[in-house]
From Swiss-Prot:
Binds 1 zinc ion per subunit. A zinc finger (C4-type) spans 17-39. The keyword rRNA processing does not apply. Zn(2+) binds at residues 17, 20, 36, 39. This is Small ribosomal subunit protein eS27. Signal peptide: none annotated. InterPro entries: Ribosomal_eS27, Ribosomal_eS27_Zn-bd_dom_sf, Ribosomal_zn-bd. The keyword NAD does not apply. One of its GO terms (molecular function) is structural constituent of ribosome. It holds the Pfam family Ribosomal_S27e. Gene3D superfamilies: Zn-binding ribosomal proteins (2.20.25.100). Part of the 30S ribosomal subunit.
């Protein structure tokens, strides 16, 4: 018997805001623009698949 499994390719990433150095966890395939909760600068822009992350990625969570 063949068992089909679907591997999850999306993940959460911890990023550092380039303007205020705030660390924030975001989804790497965000479908809405993600802004920093402290200063309001744009951290990620949706592209139809993976989001274009404009901040420094610190860690990725599986």
């Amino acid at each position: 018997m063949v068992q089909l499994t679907r591997e999850n390719r999306s993940k959460f990433v911890k990023v550092k805001c380039p303007d205020c150095e705030n660390e924030q966890t975001i989804f790497d395939r965000a479908c809405t623009p993600v802004d920093c909760i402290v200063c309001g600068s744009n951290l990620a822009t949706p592209t139809g698949g993976k989001a274009q992350i404009k901040a420094e990625i610190i860690t990725a969570f599986e």
